[in-house]
Amino acid sequence: MSNQIEIDNKIIKYLSTYSYKPNKVVDALITETKKLGEVAKMQISPEQGQFIELLVKITKAKNCLEIGRFTGLSTLFIAKGLQKNGKIFSVDNSNEFLNFAKRYWKMAKVDNKIVSIFEDGNIALKNFID
């Protein structure tokens, strides 16, 4: 038995209509990511991203750790939610899409809040704990 809540098309349409506030940089990043084909399904939705941003804001997070960045959309949302001098440490074991992500972080003016780490997530997590 699944613990997930099934979301029908009416709920998805409502969320898309009323929760996502369009953002040119985010929309461009999503559009370019879709051109990558099947792998694009790894990307979060803009609604999920705005929810993550909200969580970061209301918790007044100064630093965040992200394991797995893909094309950097969740990283961008987290960075937007961080306090002024906050940092997100974005870990990935592949740099395949790093330059792609960096372009959009710079356009969104959050690149100064992002520290990219090229490392296996398990090792990075252990290093952060130690």
What are the residue ranges of the model-derived segments?
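Beta-strand-loop-alpha "switch" segments that mediate conformational coupling across diverse proteins
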Residues: 29
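Short amphipathic alpha-helical segments at helix-loop
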Residues: 36-37, 86
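S-adenosylmethionine/decaboxylated-SAM
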Residues: 46-130
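Conserved SAM-binding loop and adjacent beta-strand
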Residues: 19-21, 37-50, 57
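N-terminal auxiliary segments of SAM/dcSAM-dependent transferases
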Residues: 1-24, 38
